[in-house]
Structures are given as C-alpha cells and as structure tokens.
C-alpha cells in the first residue's frame, strides 16, 4: 500500500470476564507471552511509518500508563467521550481523517499484512456459526448479508470477520457509519451495518 494511511485500534471495552484473571484490562494491553497485544499489532505497521490511534474508554488510564513510552507523534491514545457500540467508536476515530484507514481490533493479531492487498479488504475465516462472532455471506467478493452474533439452531458453516479491515475511501465509509450510528439498529452493531451498506 503506497498511500499514507492511519491505523485505528478500537479498545474501548475491557476483555471478557473469563480473561480477567490477570485484571480488568482493555484488550490492547492484555499480556500475551512476554508482550502485550499492542506490541504484536504494532509490529505489523511500524515499518510503514503509519500513524496509530488507539481508541479507549474503560480503564483508559491503564492504557496511557502502559503505553506512555511509545505515545508520541505517530502513536496516540484517544479517549472516547462516552461508550456506545463499535461503530460509534470507529466513527469517533475517523471523524477528521481523510486518508485510508486500517481498522485492527485490539484483540486481533493477524500475521498477514492487509496493507499489501490493493483496494478495500478484510480478513476472514470459515467456521460454524455461533452467537459469539459476526459472520457474512458474499457473492463475487461483495458482502451481501451480515449475521451479527445471531443465535443459530443448526450447524451451518459461514465466513466470519476476523477483525482487520482496510478502508480506502474513508469519507464515504464515515458517511455510511454516521447513518448507521444514527439509526441505532438493535439487531446489528452499527459498524457491521455500515459495512453491509458501503
């Protein structure tokens, strides 16, 4: 990816309760082996000199303390004014950004480089549907339907979003996201609602 871009890492909520034996931590500073999640994610982008915005809310002070040595011109921790859904968090992050963005969920470490893929992109894998993840249908590379953490009574294999997305036209995506956040769709997170319509 030759153009400048911004990396957005949403980390507004604490890790799930079953992972809190190490403390009530946001995913971005959750320990993995001898590092934290941030170290693994940042390794994917540091040689590209991309700016990184980490968006926090719950225990944001812990994130600021843990990352104080790396926060600077290229890496910023931004605090949400209030907590809503993922779509609101990402809208807040891209509100004044016009360059392309990579959205990398704080709990997602993918060793493949999404920046080497041309155009809009996201990573996915196939698995049996569960209400834990967000799945989708696609036709010829176009997302046609999204199942956001829907309960299912039968074993059906679908594609699921892994948590790394690249958006080239940030302006258009921001407008879709703004509409999705304002609609407050109760069946689907506004981020996925916008993805389905962009």
What residues fall within each predicted segment?
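Conserved N-terminal catalytic core of the sugar/cofactor nucleotidyltransferase
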Residues: 1-18, 30-31, 35-100, 183
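Structural motif
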Residues: 10-13, 55-59, 105-107, 125-127, ...
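Short glycine-/acidic-enriched loop or helix-start segments at secondary-structure transitions
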Residues: 18-20, 63-66, 89, 112-115, ...
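Short alpha-helical oligomerization interface
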Residues: 23-27
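Short, conserved catalytic or adaptor-binding loops enriched in Gly and charged residues
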Residues: 67-71, 137-138, 196-198
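Short beta-strand-to-loop acidic/aromatic patch adjacent to the donor-nucleotide binding site
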Residues: 99-109
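Conserved core of the sugar-phosphate nucleotidyltransferase
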Residues: 109-185
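Catalytic core and acceptor-binding pocket of nucleotide-sugar-dependent glycosyltransferases
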Residues: 180-198
